[in-house]
Amino acid sequence: MDENIIINILRKEMMPGLGVTEPASIALSSAKAYEVIGGEIKNIKIIADPGLFKNAFSCAIPGTKEVGNEMAALLGTICGDASLGLECLRKIKKEDVSKAKTMLDKIDIEIKSQTEGLYVESIVTTNNGIGRTIIRYKHDNIVLVEKNNKILYQKENNLNKSNNFSQEAIDSKKITEMKLDEIVEFVNNVNYEKIEFLLESIKMNKKLSEKGLEGLGIGLGKLILESCNENNYELYAEALTCSAIDARVSGAPVPAMTVTGSGNHGIITTLPLLAIKEKKNLNNEVLARSIALSYIINIYIKEFSGKLSAFCGCAVAAGTGVSAGICYLLGGSLKEIENTIKNMASNITGMICTGGNLACSLKANTGVKAAFLSAKMALNNIVIPNKCGIVSNSIEDTMKNIGRIAYPGMMETDKEILNIMIESSK
């Protein structure tokens, strides 16, 4: 495959995001809908797919102590700046939060069960009429903007039912045409300058981690760091990862570099690699190459599991990605990278997702632990053999199988998780 296609996919899948991306997506959609209509707000209606609704259900809104779909929509409408994309709530003020709390009776939320992929629709009614926005497939992919039933903007083909994926999604799907040996060959041989941009994720996510070490969220990252000695890069990796996620899910006003639409995925696919790089005094080039591998494996799996799913994509998809990156950084061969992925597939695949919340850092820690264990096993010639569980004869089928566990495998599980969350909130 043309290396420029791979590089473009990596660039496209990377994006700064403030807070968890699902409430940010709701806020962005609402901000854009209000932007085109303006006026005194009378009603806001949000229609979201079950996965997006679940992930935003109990997640903190950046810069506030508020959580959930309703507050994300209200704040997006009241103070969101759509030009900032997934950082649209960057300019939030205390008075905006106070105003939003007085308007909770003006919002309606509907779950759109019969939809494929990510979906959020915002309908904002004011004294000037109705503004409507639809986001599809990617968290910031606005495909329709209407003002009083007049189309102001529409992405060609994106609302056509026969076209299940946007052009952006089709591009990323090309990753699944690659064999693992082709992926590793790209990682080894691509000109460093062409992938140096991947280090931007390290800078951004490290700042978020430092914020989390102040004790935000459940304080797991801070707790782990306190028991970490100077040379233990595994515990250091867990601490960096968990503290960044602690900060993110608790609403810290610091962006993460997302990948495949998720800040947590972006954190897990990068910070454990930074931990190894720092503790072993490695150079930036080998770090960038390991990130490229981590990202590509994560993207590969996510193309089969979907952007949002019943399993914890952070621990499973991103965890598998970073396990390959860890093996690479520790000097692993192609065969050892393959065996690392087999070990991960046999370990935590199937861990459920209960949305973006304070428990995310706990699941992330499990994913990072499993990633290091899988790599160490492979580097010591320990591997789960083919035809054992979901491990297939080809590593590409094994990665596909990881995704298949989520979709279609766990679709009923996802529904039941959402039902439990809604019941528990009453």
UniProtKB/Swiss-Prot annotation:
Pfam families for this protein: SDH_alpha (PF03313)
GO terms of biological process kind: L-cysteine catabolic process to pyruvate
Record InterPro entries: Ser_deHydtase-like_asu, UPF0597
A GO MF term: L-cysteine desulfhydrase activity
Disulphide bond pairs: none
Family: Belongs to the UPF0597 family.
The protein, known as: UPF0597 protein CBO1815/CLC_1757
Naturally occurring in which organism (per UniProt): Clostridium botulinum (strain Hall / ATCC 3502 / NCTC 13319 / Type A)
